């Protein structure tokens, strides 16, 4: 059966995802930035209260994946912390100025990660040569690659996802970006073993008083709602995957 990884942006989201049947959690902060390294408190809370595997992302900022020396130093500190807290895996990714895998720095992080299972995240979708990158990540010992097939959505990227799945001699290819209940069968149909979803929705604030005209970020953002995992959607996706496994074919 396809493994269902759910992207979570808080401890509360992780607990919802776990209760709904997620097989694994990618733990991030800041959904509006595409996911950055979660706080120490969130990491500790997840270690204490979440029993399914949790893989925190190690990403010091939003934007591209070509990092300065100081940013890379932060990544090493954060990865060592995640390792020492006992997480079974971590999610990382670095590119150089030409859009190739930053082999030297990735090698340093892999050595630092030790026994943790390392996912190379969607920096892969920004690399210049995906098949070369797959070979390099295989040599580095990466456990899985999270990718949309270098398209805006994984469904649009199905041709490259199929090619990567057929070519991989090591890393699992995990589809992510726009993975939904309605298209799960398409990823199973090309032989993938894992999918990644946010399965999220906006939850309204409990505040009754709402100050108008002031924003803590972008003016167009709603300060009185936050993004959270939709437990019902995770349950529905998990049920669909179980049904696909039971009947032994795509639905």
From Swiss-Prot:
Pfam families for the chain: CutC (PF03932)
Compartments, as annotated in UniProt: Cytoplasm
- The superkingdom of the source organism is Bacteria
Q: Which GO terms describe its molecular function?
A: copper ion binding
Q: Which of UniProt's keywords are assigned here? A: Cytoplasm
Gene3D superfamilies reported in the protein's UniProt record: Copper homeostasis (CutC) domain
For this protein, the parts annotated as crossing the membrane are: none
Q: Does the keyword section mention Cytoplasm?
A: yes
List the InterPro entries: CutC-like (IPR005627), CutC-like_dom_sf (IPR036822)
Instruction: List the GO cellular component terms.
Output: cytoplasm
Its family remark reads: Belongs to the CutC family.
Which protein are we looking at? PF03932 family protein CutC
Q: Which organism is it from?
A: Edwardsiella ictaluri (strain 93-146)
Gene name in the database record: cutC
């Amino acid at each position: 059966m396809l493994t269902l990884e759910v992207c979570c942006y808080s401890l509360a989201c992780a607990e919802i995802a776990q209760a709904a049947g997620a097989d694994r959690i990618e733990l991030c902060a800041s959904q509006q930035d595409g996911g950055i390294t979660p706080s120490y408190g969130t990491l500790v809370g997840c270690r204490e209260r979440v029993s399914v595997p949790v893989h925190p992302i190690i990403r010091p900022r939003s934007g591209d994946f070509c990092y300065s020396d100081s940013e890379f130093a932060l990544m090493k500190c954060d990865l060592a912390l995640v390792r020492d807290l006992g997480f079974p895996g971590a999610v990382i990714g670095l590119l150089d100025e030409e859009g190739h895998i930053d082999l030297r720095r990735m090698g340093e992080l892999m050595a630092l990660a030790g026994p943790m299972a390392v996912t190379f995240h969607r920096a892969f979708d920004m690399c210049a040569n995906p098949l070369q990158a797959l070979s390099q990540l295989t040599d580095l010992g990466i456990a899985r690659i999270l990718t949309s097939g270098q398209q805006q959505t994984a469904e649009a990227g199905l041709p490259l996802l199929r090619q990567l799945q057929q070519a991989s001699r090591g890393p699992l290819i995990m589809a992510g970006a726009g993975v939904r209940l309605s298209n799960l069968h398409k990823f199973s149909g090309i032989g993938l073993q894992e999918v990644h979803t946010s399965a999220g929705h906006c939850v309204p604030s409990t505040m009754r008083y709402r100050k108008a005209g002031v924003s803590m970020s972008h003016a167009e953002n709603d300060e009185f709602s936050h993004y959270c995992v939709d437990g019902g959607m995770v349950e529905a996706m998990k049920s669909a995957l179980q049904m696909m496994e039971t009947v032994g074919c795509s639905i």
